[in-house]
Amino acid sequence: MAKLLVKQVRSKINCPLSQKRGLEALGLRKLGQVVEHESNPAILGMINKVKHLVSVEEAK
């Protein structure tokens, strides 16, 4: 499976609780933080839920 780099680019202030929990589940706590995840359906679903708050790139 491919590796994904997920970076939080927007604040979670004024977001619904489910989106805040999605960011925490991805391991994103601070603005500008980058985490690496395996590409699987669970992770892709979480990313889709908060796609307006994060940027996603494929890791090299």
From Swiss-Prot:
Gene Ontology annotations for the cellular component aspect, listed alphabetically: cytosolic large ribosomal subunit
- InterPro entries under this entry? Ribo_uL30_ferredoxin-like_sf (IPR036919), Ribosomal_uL30_bac-type (IPR005996), Ribosomal_uL30_ferredoxin-like (IPR016082)
The UniProt entry's GO biological process terms, in alphabetical order, are:
translation
Superkingdom per UniProt: Bacteria
- Give an example GO molecular function: structural constituent of ribosome
The entry's keywords: Ribonucleoprotein, Ribosomal protein
| Signal peptide residue numbers | none
Q: Which family does it belong to?
A: Belongs to the universal ribosomal protein uL30 family.
Q: How does it assemble?
A: Part of the 50S ribosomal subunit.
User: What protein name is recorded for this chain?
Assistant: Large ribosomal subunit protein uL30
Species whose genome carries this gene: Flavobacterium johnsoniae (strain ATCC 17061 / DSM 2064 / JCM 8514 / BCRC 14874 / CCUG 350202 / NBRC 14942 / NCIMB 11054 / UW101) (Cytophaga johnsonae)
Name of encoding gene: rpmD
